[in-house]
């Protein structure tokens, strides 16, 4: 078996960041400028396609041959580029070094990963690349100085072109060095297969209703203009969208100081009974304008390919620590819920730009448009969407992992975990916790406890989950925490067992088993790589780079590792603890359940077009009635997972022509 490492530099007039790689590649003016490669670690060669050089026949054959494993950093891009010219290349011949780095706990980005691994200067990515990419890879503005051209070619600056070739060559050097450094921690074959399936799903894409999208963009713009004009008329402000101007106006009109105009502040002010009609309406307009964003519709419009499908919505292994997928472009993992009825009529009114009718029937136009974003994803003519999602997957997984038997029994029977939790916490028969009984009020406490407390959260977690907004007095929160922990002793014990085991393996080395998980300290002495790992029941590992033990604010041992800070986006030392490690494992196991299920669905000829944590969406020509089709999918999702045969899974869903939250 040979190994072919590749890096391409390309040109397209389509902006890749907004439109995604598939639309970028599908542009008629797309071309590959440079092709850098190395075979079996030999010195890197470069082919200058932009200046007339050609790939030798043996290299073209190698790209399509199963005798050559192709490596690239962000391999889906190189795979997509070459597939445009050579036909769809077999995904199983490709390996992605960026994914390998993410699997091993590092960050994305060739430069960032090289620095995190401590690569020597001669092995790192050159820092001249961004300016060169801006010069050669994207259109340029026509000026008098450049003769009015809209694109820079090699002959326009030969010195820069030679630098660009060196930059491309060095990217292969860096990619190979990263792969060499990670080779002691290989990606399991079954996870590699999941990456290959993901490549196919992302390339398959999802159809979108562009009449709905364009109608929503039009109505959103008209509504925004109407609201702004009304606000200007009431307030006499030049720009009522200005927070500073509106704050000053409200302070003068209300006679009180305002710290901000955030969503919750506006909602609180709207609840005041002594507001003047003008103040009340200005606050309502402010609230409405906060919902008029059409960014997701803009994102769909920017990313839709010529065939009416959006591709590249998910990044495999995009979520740090857990290995879950991350949303890209339209962010399908963060779409507003749909509760407006009837949805088909709302969609029709938006498609035909019937603003007055939409407002008359549904009230708030911005809120309706926000909900309809989901429904922009559709089945093409002659097809249907089959949507199915796991029921309470994280609650089931943590119960199974901890061995909390009463919870497992709930999931094997009626599944009413909120009622059952309240029953356990307050010693009330579950039969009494139903609508119409005074005991039903306990369900709310059981629900917020279930949502907030599974990963060692306390009163702060309850507040963040909305306990106070539900009307639960703050003084009741400590009691809810203690009751939930007492009712879930095995889950509570799991937090502390994980914390103790992690401290032990980080300080002493070796490995410790906890409830079917194997925690270990792993080294590659040759490369100086040091990781704390957790082997999951599936056989996948979670990696924590350069682990250490410090002291937290309470004087207890504090577990830390190097990772990407989600707020600052910097590679830094991050603290963790037992409950957080449990959360990582539970979400990772839930992710593995989904990944296994996707493989089964694909094998059954049910093509997945995208998925969201615990939910899959299939686009297919109907082969039976709706109930039969849904049962087929749901039964596959309910099948026991081979490595978690006693984990009780359940699923439900719907069949329709557009995406929604049922």
Residue ranges: model-predicted function:
Residues 12, 76-87, 104, 248-253, ...:
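Short active-site loop/helix that positions an aromatic residue
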Residues 621-627:
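Helix N-cap motif at beta-to-alpha junctions
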Residues 182-194, 593-616:
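Active-site palm subdomain of RNA-directed nucleic acid polymerases
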Residues 256, 428-604, 648, 652-662:
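Conserved catalytic core of nucleic-acid polymerases
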């Amino acid at each position: 078996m040979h190994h072919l490492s590749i890096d391409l530099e390309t040109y397209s007039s389509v902006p890749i960041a907004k439109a995604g790689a598939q639309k970028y590649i599908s542009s008629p003016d797309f071309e590959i400028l440079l092709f850098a490669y190395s075979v079996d670690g030999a010195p890197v060669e470069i082919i200058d396609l932009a200046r007339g050089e050609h790939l030798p026949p043996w290299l073209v054959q190698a790209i399509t041959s199963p005798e050559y494993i192709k490596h690239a950093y962000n391999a889906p891009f190189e795979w997509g580029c070459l597939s445009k010219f050579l036909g769809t290349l077999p995904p199983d011949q490709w390996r992605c070094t960026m994914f390998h780095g993410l699997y091993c706990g590092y960050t994305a980005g060739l430069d960032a990963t090289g620095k995190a691994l401590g690569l020597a200067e001669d092995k790192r990515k050159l820092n001249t690349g961004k300016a060169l990419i801006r010069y050669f890879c994207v259109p340029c503005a026509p000026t008098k100085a450049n003769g009015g051209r809209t694109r820079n070619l090699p002959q326009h600056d030969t010195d820069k072109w030679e630098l660009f070739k060196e930059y491309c060559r060095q990217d292969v050097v860096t990619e190979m060095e990263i792969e060499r450094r990670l080779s002691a921690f290989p990606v399991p074959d079954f996870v590699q297969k999941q990456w290959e399936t993901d490549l196919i799903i992302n390339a398959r894409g999802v159809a979108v209703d562009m009449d709905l999208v364009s109608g929503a963009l039009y109505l959103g713009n008209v509504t925004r203009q109407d609201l702004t004009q009304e606000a200007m008329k009431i307030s006499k402000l030049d720009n009522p969208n200005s927070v500073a101007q509106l704050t000053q106006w409200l302070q003068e009109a209300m006679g009180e100081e305002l710290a901000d105009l955030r969503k919750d502040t506006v909602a609180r002010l709207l609840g005041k009974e002594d507001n003047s009609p003008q103040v009340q309406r200005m606050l309502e307009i402010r609230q409405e304008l906060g919902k008029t964003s059409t960014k997701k519709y803009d994102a769909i419009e920017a990313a839709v390919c010529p065939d009416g499908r959006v591709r590249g919505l998910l990044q495999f292994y995009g979520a740090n620590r857990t290995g879950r997928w991350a949303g890209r472009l339209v962010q399908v993992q963060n779409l507003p819920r749909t509760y407006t009825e009837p949805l088909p009529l709302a969609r029709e009114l938006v498609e035909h730009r019937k603003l007055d009718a939409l407002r008359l029937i549904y009230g708030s136009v911005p809120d309706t448009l926000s909900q309809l974003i989901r429904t922009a994803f559709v089945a093409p003519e002659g097809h249907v969407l089959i949507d199915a999602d796991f029921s309470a997957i994280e609650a089931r997984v943590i119960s199974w992992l901890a061995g909390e038997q009463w919870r497992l029994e709930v999931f094997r029977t009626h599944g009413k975990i909120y009622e059952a939790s309240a029953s356990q916490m307050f010693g009330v028969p579950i039969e009494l916790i139903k609508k119409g009984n005074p005991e039903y009020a306990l369900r709310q406490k059981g629900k917020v406890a279930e949502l907030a407390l599974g990963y060692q959260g306390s009163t702060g977690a309850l507040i963040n989950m909305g306990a106070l907004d539900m009307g639960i007095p703050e003084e009741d929160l400590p009691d809810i925490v203690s009751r939930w922990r007492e009712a879930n002793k095995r889950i509570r014990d799991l937090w502390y067992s994980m914390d103790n085991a992690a401290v032990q393996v980080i300080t002493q080395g070796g490995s410790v088993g906890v409830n079917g998980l194997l925690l270990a300290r792993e080294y590659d002495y040759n490369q100086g790589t040091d990781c704390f790992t957790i082997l999951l029941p599936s056989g996948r590992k979670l990696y924590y780079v350069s682990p250490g033990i410090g002291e937290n604010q309470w004087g207890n041992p504090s577990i830390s590792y190097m990772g990407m800070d989600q707020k600052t986006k910097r590679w830094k030392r991050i603290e963790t603890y037992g409950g957080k490690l449990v959360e990582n494992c539970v979400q990772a196991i839930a992710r593995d359940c989904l990944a296994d299920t996707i493989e089964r669905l694909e094998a059954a000829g049910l093509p997945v077009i995208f998925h969201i944590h615990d939910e899959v969406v299939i686009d297919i020509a109907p082969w039976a009635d709706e109930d039969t089709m849904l049962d087929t999918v749901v039964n596959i999702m309910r099948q026991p997972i081979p490595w978690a045969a006693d984990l009780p899974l359940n699923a439900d869903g719907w069949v329709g022509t557009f995406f929604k939250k049922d």
